[in-house]
């Protein structure tokens, strides 16, 4: 593997090998990360990257598209079958571009959109002021009830009635509960808005049938194809409305993108095929079991979990009672081979660059084959680290760092990731 890279560019080869080692021997708990199969990785690294294919299958602006047409057609048909959609666009380069395409297809610059506040669990592209969505459109953010820390649907309705948005966005990047899509659609219909659901985080759960399918209520659904779907980095747009599908297609190309990434689209097709298996369904069930178990273990150790738990693949830990910042916790854990990300919590008092919480997700460790027993062990190790942080920079007592680093390595060796499947690389 990578023998040609080693010959041509030793510096990048070093990057590849060291990143492989980091993934192989570290505990990945960032909720938006996962480990793609070698089938997906091989497809992304194929000669399909050489092919320009502006347009759509059978309607290209270039010749020689016979086989990339086939790849995209497979991706489209599999996406439609997987999620029960009548129309699918597999060309978005990312979830952000999928969201941008929907906004520009259904609204005009200056129109009002509603999305969950970033500080309450939303995403940058749902209207954050620093993002294109917050610059192009008038944004009315909604949030969670500060008592229950779940979406305040009455407040969503009140804001919608007051501001009459063109689009209401449901979904988030740090929201652990199942969203009431039916309630959102009722609110959207009441004010004549489109309902767009961004299911980037929980698409894998939807594909496995263990999470409500937003297509039952949404006018249009966007997603990424990595995260819980465990595919290549990319975007996806689904709808059952032919007019919306036509508008979205025109907005993706020629609106905001040129040539599609055919090597990634083919890898999406592989990902969708993998997601149709019974093995994938069992995997997703275990992802949720693991998240629930780990959240419970944190609660046993005196940590406060935002909203009291989780229904999905992730949860937020409020570190305020432990007198440690999210930034310090992230640094401390990383020094021991455990990766999480600092995250704001509802009613946050600190800067998002410091934050009062950490976000934890179980998709990646579950891909390795870990189950509830390992979640208990991981929670115990995290608690040990966070109980021995000596300063605001996340410095951990040396003896604790050494102990936990050793335990992390041993745990990862019990659940190999890629090292028993690839040849020619010593890790």
UniProtKB/Swiss-Prot annotation:
State the Gene Ontology terms under molecular function: glycine hydroxymethyltransferase activity; pyridoxal phosphate binding
Q: What is its EC number?
A: 2.1.2.1
- Share an example GO biological-process annotation for this protein: glycine biosynthetic process from serine
**Could you say which cofactors this protein requires?**
pyridoxal 5'-phosphate
Task: Show the PROSITE patterns listed in the entry.
Answer: SHMT
Keyword Repeat found? no
**Entry GO terms, CC:** cytosol
Q: Any keyword Nucleotide-binding? A: no
Function of the molecule: Catalyzes the reversible interconversion of serine and glycine with tetrahydrofolate (THF) serving as the one-carbon carrier. This reaction serves as the major source of one-carbon groups required for the biosynthesis of purines, thymidylate, methionine, and other important biomolecules. Also exhibits THF-independent aldolase activity toward beta-hydroxyamino acids, producing glycine and aldehydes, via a retro-aldol mechanism.
**What is the name attached to this protein's record?**
Serine hydroxymethyltransferase
- Source species of the chain: Thermotoga petrophila (strain ATCC BAA-488 / DSM 13995 / JCM 10881 / RKU-1)
Q: What is the lineage of its organism?
A: Bacteria, Thermotogati, Thermotogota, Thermotogae, Thermotogales
């Amino acid at each position: 593997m990578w023998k040609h890279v080693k010959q041509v560019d030793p510096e990048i080869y070093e990057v590849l090998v060291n990143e492989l080692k980091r993934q192989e021997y570290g505990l990945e708990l960032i909720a938006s990360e996962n480990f793609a199969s070698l089938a997906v990785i091989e497809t992304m690294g194929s000669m399909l990257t050489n092919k320009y294919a502006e347009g759509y299958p059978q309607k290209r602006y270039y010749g020689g598209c016979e086989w990339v047409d086939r790849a995209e057609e497979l991706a489209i048909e599999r996406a439609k079958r997987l999620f029960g959609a009548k129309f699918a666009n597999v060309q978005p380069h990312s979830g952000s571009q999928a969201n941008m395409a929907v906004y520009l297809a259904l609204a005009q610059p200056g129109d009002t959109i509603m999305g969950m506040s970033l500080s309450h669990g939303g995403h940058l592209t749902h209207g954050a002021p620093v993002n294109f969505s917050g610059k192009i459109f008038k944004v009315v953010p909604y949030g969670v009830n500060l008592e229950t820390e779940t979406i305040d649907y009455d407040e969503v309705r009140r804001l919608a009635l007051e501001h009459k948005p063109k689009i209401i966005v449901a979904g988030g990047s740090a929201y652990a509960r199942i969203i009431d899509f039916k309630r959102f659609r009722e609110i959207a219909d009441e004010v004549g808005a489109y309902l767009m659901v961004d299911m980037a985080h929980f698409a894998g759960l939807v594909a496995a049938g263990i999470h409500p399918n937003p297509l039952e209520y949404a006018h249009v659904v966007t997603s990424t194809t990595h995260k819980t779907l465990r595919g290549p980095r990319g975007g996806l747009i689904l709808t059952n409305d032919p007019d919306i599908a036509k508008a979205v297609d025109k907005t993706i190309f020629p609106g905001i993108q040129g040539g599609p990434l055919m090597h990634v689209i083919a890898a999406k097709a592989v990902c969708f095929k993998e997601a149709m298996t019974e093995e994938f369904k069992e995997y997703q069930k275990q992802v949720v079991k693991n998240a629930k178990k780990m959240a419970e273990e944190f609660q046993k150790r005196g940590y406060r979990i935002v909203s009291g738990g989780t229904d999905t693949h992730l949860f937020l830990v409020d570190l305020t009672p432990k007198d440690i910042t999210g930034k310090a916790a992230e640094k401390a854990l990383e020094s021991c081979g455990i990766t999480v990300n600092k995250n704001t919590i509802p009613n946050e008092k600190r800067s998002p660059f410091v934050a009062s919480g950490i976000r934890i997700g179980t998709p990646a460790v579950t891909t390795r084959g870990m189950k509830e027993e390992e979640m208990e062990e991981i929670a115990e190790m995290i608690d040990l680290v966070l109980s021995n942080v000596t300063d605001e920079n996340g410095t951990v007592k040396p003896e604790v760092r050494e102990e936990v680093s050793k335990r992390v390595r041993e745990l990862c060796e019990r659940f190999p990731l890629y090292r028993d499947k690839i040849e020619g690389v010593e890790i």
